[in-house]
Design a protein with these regions (language model features):
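Short C-terminal tail/terminal secondary-structure segment
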Residues: 1-7, 154, 233, 244-255
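Short, small/polar-rich loop/turn modules that mediate ligand/substrate recognition or access, typified
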Residues: 95, 181, 186, 243-245
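Substrate-binding pocket helix/loop in short-chain dehydrogenase/reductase
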Residues: 105-106, 110-118, 213
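C-terminal substrate-recognition "lid" of short-chain dehydrogenase/reductases
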Residues: 126-129, 222-250
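Active-site helix of classical SDR
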Residues: 129, 165, 173
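Alpha-helical segment proximal to the catalytic Tyr-Lys
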Residues: 134, 178-182, 241
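Residue(s) in the substrate-gating loop at a strand-loop-helix junction
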Residues: 149
Length: 255
């Protein structure tokens, strides 16, 4: 256990995380379990999801629930959310983390690929929120945390569909926040910089990438998944009760 903040308001709170089996999502699930929250998470990577569930059961005795589900399948996602709420109680925290940042060129994008990128990076965030808002409203409030990206803010090339989807999340967050604020539901966006997940390191980090981070980040060092998870904990907890419709950037001072 680390020496960072403990949030009493998160104990026993029902939390739902998309894309929770690996990377940033894995860290988010882990940190909520350590806070004593009741966590359910979905992912398409069943082996990784089961491994995380078992590992946390052994580590903290507070095993999350893992359910294999593709966020692209809207009906299945909303059915999974209903199932979780029937068994665990009202979801008070939704973390829309699932995404796919595969690189792609302008000329390679088809209409089908474009729609798939919107589905995996944007569409599910709205429909997951749609599914949890009625319960949050009835319970007296909640926190919806969407994940954006630094990529569109800095004009990153090589993945136009991804950048478009992530740019739209800021508008989604602000629109939802205005609509549901009267129910004491907060909606915010977390904007990561270049986070050193296993996937990023394996696929894209090279010497030039290291030099770019050294040049562009105001802070030395590297962003790791736990840095994002700690921001998510704050936005989920009552400590951020008057924070809504905002972007919280964790980029080491890049943008």
């Amino acid at each position: 256990m680390d020496s960072y903040a403990i949030y009493p308001s998160l104990k026993d709170k029902v939390v739902f995380v998309t894309g929770g089996a690996t990377g940033i999502g894995e860290s988010i699930v882990t940190h909520f379990c350590r806070q004593g929250s009741k966590v359910a998470f979905v992912d398409i990577n069943a082996p990784a999801g089961e491994k995380l569930r078992a590992g946390l059961a052994a580590e903290v005795g507070n095993a999350p629930e893992f359910l294999r589900c593709s966020v692209i399948d809207t009906d299945a996602l909303q059915a999974t959310i209903r199932d979780v709420q029937e068994r665990l109680g009202v979801i008070r925290v939704l973390v829309n983390n699932a995404a796919n940042d595969d690189r792609h060129s302008i000329e390679s994008v088809t209409a089908q690929y474009w729609d798939e990128r919107m589905a995996v990076n944007l569409r599910h965030q709205f429909f997951a929120a749609q599914a949890v808002i009625p319960g949050m409203q009835q319970a007296g409030g909640g926190s919806i945390i969407n994940f954006g990206s630094l990529s569109w803010k800095v004009g990153m090339g090589g993945m136009p569909a991804y950048v478009t989807a992530k740019a739209a999340i800021g508008g989604l967050t602000r629109g939802l926040a205005r609509d549901v604020g009267k129910f004491n539901i907060r909606v915010n966006t977390v904007v990561p910089g270049w986070v050193m997940t296993d996937r990023q390191i394996r696929l894209w980090l090279d010497a030039e990438g290291e030099r770019t981070m050294d040049r562009m980040q105001s802070l030395a060092g590297r962003i790791v998944p736990d840095d994002l998870a700690r921001m998510v904990l704050f936005l989920a907890a009552d400590d951020s009760r008057m924070c809504s419709a905002q972007e919280f950037v964790v980029d080491a001072g890049w943008a």
